[in-house]
UniProtKB/Swiss-Prot annotation:
Top EC group: hydrolase
Places the protein is found: Cytoplasm
Disulfide pairings: none
Main function: Cleaves both 3' and 5' ssDNA extremities of branched DNA structures.
NCBIfam families for the chain: PRK03298.1 (NF002876)
Keyword Nucleotide-binding among UniProt keywords: no
Membrane-crossing residue ranges in chain numbering: none
Pfam families recorded: NucS_C, NucS_N
Protein's UniProt keywords contain Nuclease: yes
GO molecular function: DNA binding; single-stranded DNA endodeoxyribonuclease activity
UniProt-listed Enzyme Commission number(s): 3.1.-.-
Protein's UniProt name: Endonuclease NucS
Listed GO CC annotations: cytoplasm
């Protein structure tokens, strides 16, 4: 079974990719999750990391310099270079299989309504399956677009960055399946936070704002596609 690794270290962090970013020396929590993701945390940002790398990515160690450098690289060649100045804690843990979040009543109803009226995603769309199971959890809706291409839909009541990250992980996994690939993504929610919309757009994920009242048959506005 895969393990999650927790490291507390004095370190500097450099991101090298589409842009560059530098975090000066400080004590930080380095989180290596079983899904392959790596994130760097401080003590003042709740759950949000200072920097991160989404799976699939690979960790190697460069030990030729004065301090070891942990290099996390993804398939696009982007890197997190973590220079380790000192380690205070390093432990690994098996968390077991997580049952996942249980959708609240509104999200479950949104999923059912969108599955019933799949044309709201676009003309010619057809539903393949609700709760399409993957190795990392169920995709809310798996559909086909008007050209027969695969589309994965993640549905939230409030669309935030963690929802986009969740859909990104599903897409990366589904696109390894030669039967389904290429798979596009749609992030659907009653309200989508600006940061989540920017991240989704940057990753080629389409956003759909849902009007719950309209979907229940009440006249309260139009659907908005962005």
């Amino acid at each position: 079974m895969s393990r999650v690794r927790l490291v507390i270290a004095q370190c500097t962090v450099d991101y090298i990719g589409r842009l560059t970013a530098h975090l000066p020396s400080a004590r930080r929590l380095l989180l290596f999750k079983a899904d392959g993701s790596v994130s760097v945390h401080a003590d003042d940002r709740a759950y949000k990391p200072l920097n991160w790398m989404s799976p699939p990515c690979w960790l190697t160690e460069e030990s030729g310099g004065q301090a070891p450098v942990w290099v996390v690289e993804n398939k696009a060649g982007e890197q997190l270079r973590i220079t380790i100045e000192g380690i205070e804690h390093d432990s690994s843990h098996e968390l077991g299989v997580d049952p996942g979040l249980v959708k609240d009543g509104v999200e479950a109803h949104l999923q059912a309504l969108l599955a019933e009226h799949i044309q709201l995603l676009g003309e010619g769309y057809t539903l393949v399956r609700r709760e399409y199971m993957t190795a990392i959890g169920p995709v809310d809706l798996l559909c086909r677009d008007e050209r027969g291409g695969s589309v994965a839909v993640e549905i939230k009541r409030r669309g935030e960055i963690d929802g986009v990250e969740q859909l990104t992980r599903y897409l990366e996994l589904l696109n390894r399946d030669s039967v389904l690939a290429p798979v596009k993504g749609v992030f659907a929610a009653q309200q989508i936070k600006p940061q989540a919309r920017i991240l989704a757009t940057d990753r080629g994920i389409r956003c759909l704002t849902l009007d719950y009242d309209t979907m229940r048959g009440m006249d309260s506005g139009e659907y908005r596609l962005f």
